[in-house]
Amino acid sequence: MDCYLLLLVSYVIFVILGYKKFELPIISPTMITLVSLTIVIALGYWYRYEMGTDLYFYTFIVIALGGGAILGTGYGIQRWAKLNWGDPTSIENNFDSNCYPLVGIVNLPVRYKYISMYMIFFILFSLFCVFINTTGDSDASRMTQYRDIILYPQLHPNDTRFVFINSQFYKIAWAITYVSAYVAIYNGVILNKPIFKGTGLLTIVIFFCIGSSIAMGARQPAIEIFIFMILTYLFLMVKEQYFDQVKRFLFKLIPITIISPFLYILYGILVGRHDGNNVTLQRVTELLAGGIYALNIHIWEPARTIYFGQSSFADVYDKLINFGLLPESARMAYHEFDKFGNTLSLFGRWYEDFGILGVIIMSIIVTALFSLAYEYLQRRSNGNIWTHVWTAIFLTELVSLVWAGYDDRIRALLAFSQFVIIGLI
């Protein structure tokens, strides 16, 4: 039995059922997660011969049950929301969205010129931090050193000058960029204004991508702002019932989606990653599908955890350790995968802690929280300022689900702060 093919077919069925039978919007947390995993599984299936192994049947069971739990929970929450909160259009029937431009509500005159000046300062200060904390003649080698300093500051106690200050400048730049993007996209969808032309948004985003890559030694912040912008556009388009435009936009995204992994790898050169010179389909597949193969390899020998939820709630334990409330031994010793990256796929951490039942339970909890927040925000009036605040926060969290099949950022979904944010929404 080809368990990998069986898994791929199962997830294709999940996506079709969710979109066609259950009528889940493509922007819903359930569909985002299932589509993300389906793409990753499809790449892994294509690459299975090079990997030299098939999936164990037990691995198929774990991932398939997790996907089924996500689909069932998403559909159940949608049905519950319609029965108890009504249809998403019911609150908006008498709502004239043209009377409620976001800029008018927030009274936020976005001065793109001043923002651009701050971004330039942020880039220059980040470069300053790199050059005073590293040595060498090559810019690439300096970035590699700086990235190592960012990741392991305890190993470089004398090479962290101004790094903390620059991290605060990064947070300011991050907040400014996300707010600017949300405001511009909102006014583009609701008021039919240009999103990029004449707004300066593209300049701000490009500056942020450059600055964040240098300051954090990572390419994720740059990629995630684009994912956030796409999610914001789709969320608002669905909320305004512009379904035909959504379909056209999704078709336009297909070629961008195809080339984006290659650009992601190439972008690694800027942040000191050695894989930036290996821009091949094989490398893309190793990155995106590696988590599934890693889970398959370690399915019988998961990482040994001592404390309850030590792998799943790693972020929570890290905070408690940093505050001195737990010993250093409580910190999760992650699996190291030189070839596959640092993830065990979406379900790996939950499986390490709680087994197959834990995968099902945690899939239900996370999907339910995100789906409830989504259904609630879809019914909130655009005339309420807090709707925009919570929508923007929710969409930043939703980015994690887009990474569901690949990146270890998924662990943040189980951090205590994420549950608090979604619960408050």
Question: Residues of each region from the PLM?
Answer:
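N-terminal "leader" segments that precede or initiate the main folded domain
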Residues: 1-120, 199-209, 225-266, 404-425
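Hydrophobic alpha-helical transmembrane segments
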Residues: 3-11, 14-22, 44-49, 115-129, 167-182, 186-191, 208-216, 340, ...
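Hydrophobic, membrane-inserted alpha-helices
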Residues: 10-15, 41, 180-184, 204-212, ...
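Membrane-interface helix-loop-helix junctions at transmembrane boundaries of multi-pass membrane enzymes
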Residues: 22-27, 184-200, 375-389
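Membrane-embedded catalytic interface detector for glycan/lipid assembly enzymes
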Residues: 83-217, 222-242, 261-273
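Small-residue-enriched transmembrane helix-hairpin modules in multi-pass membrane proteins
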Residues: 146-167, 251-254, 260-371
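Hydrophobic alpha-helical segments
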Residues: 342-425
